[in-house]
Design a protein with these regions (language model features):
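Cell-wall polysaccharide-cleaving catalytic domain and substrate-binding groove, primarily
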Residues: 1-155
Length: 155
């Protein structure tokens, strides 16, 4: 619950910014990902339930070392599971691992994360690199970069 609360603080309330790649969101829950949810009227408690079921449980957060729970969960919410796993896989490989960077949180990735003892700061640095690369590819997103950068360092 504590980790979910921190993510909720970063996500804020209702937003429908046409320039935001997330589209219509409330508490970080996107209409595009959850078309059956009344996003505009979503309550904080409703968002917490979605976070727990869809982003925490389904993404196997607790299969990772506890030090990485918060950042992995936050990346799943903000960037999607596949990108989150790819960032962690790259961080493991940057420490001498040899994972296929495929975005799958399978037994080989889980074992390699544990074996490599990849540090939180290493994952943060790969996350910041992802955002920088994204803004390079899509300059229109530069207005979001500072917030993403700050979030990457705080989580």
């Amino acid at each position: 619950d504590e980790i979910i609360e921190v993510v909720l603080e970063h996500e804020g309330g209702y937003v429908n910014d046409p320039k935001d790649p997330g589209g219509e969101t409330n508490f970080g829950i996107a209409k595009r990902s959850h078309p059956d949810v009344d996003i505009k009227n979503l309550t904080k408690e409703g968002a917490k339930e979605i976070y727990k079921e869809v982003y925490w449980d389904k993404n196997k957060v607790e299969s990772l070392p506890e030090e990485l729970w918060h950042i992995y969960f936050d990346m799943c919410v903000n960037q999607g599971k596949s990108r989150a796993v790819k960032i962690i896989q790259r961080a493991v490989n940057g420490k001498g691992g040899s994972l296929t960077v495929d975005g799958g949180m399978g037994p080989m990735t889980i074992a390699a994360i544990g074996k490599s003892r990849v540090e939180l700061d290493r994952v943060r640095s790969y996350r910041v690199k992802y955002y920088a690369d994204l803004v390079t590819r899509k300059p229109d997103l530069e207005r979001f970069y500072f917030g993403w950068f700050k979030r990457a360092l705080e989580v």
